[in-house]
Swiss-Prot record:
Keyword Nucleus attached: no
Disulfide feature: none
Main location as per UniProt: other
Assembly and interaction partners: The gas vesicle shell is 2 nm thick and consists of a single layer of this protein. It forms helical ribs nearly perpendicular to the long axis of the vesicle.
InterPro entries the record matches: Gas-vesicle_GvpA-like (IPR000638), GvpA (IPR050530), GvpA-like_CS (IPR018493)
Entry protein name: Gas vesicle protein A
Subcellular location(s) of the protein: Gas vesicle shell
Functional description taken from the UniProt entry: Gas vesicles are hollow, gas filled proteinaceous nanostructures found in some microorganisms. During planktonic growth they allow positioning of the organism at a favorable depth for light or nutrient acquisition. GvpA forms the protein shell.
GO MF: structural molecule activity
Family: Belongs to the gas vesicle GvpA family.
This protein's UniProt keywords: Gas vesicle
Organism: Thiocapsa pendens
Length: 66
């Protein structure tokens, strides 16, 4: 059982390392309405990446200040 736990944690570490290295963007849009009347609308964009990865891509698309 200890071998499986060790493998699982190293796999999780590899996944987290890859996400921080490559980055991931989660786009969410939620709308709550009742009888055709919109009560709540939420839009969210979550970016998960290392600072180095973010700065590299932000510079490539012109989001950083020169």
């Amino acid at each position: 059982a200890k071998v499986a736990n060790s493998t699982d944690s190293s796999s999780l570490a590899e996944v987290i390392d890859r996400i921080l290295d490559k980055g991931i963007v989660i786009d969410a849009w939620v709308k709550v309405s009742l009888v055709g009347i919109e009560l709540l609308a939420i839009e969210a964009r979550v970016v998960v990446a290392s600072v180095e990865t973010y700065l590299k891509y932000a510079e490539a698309i012109g989001l950083t200040i020169p």
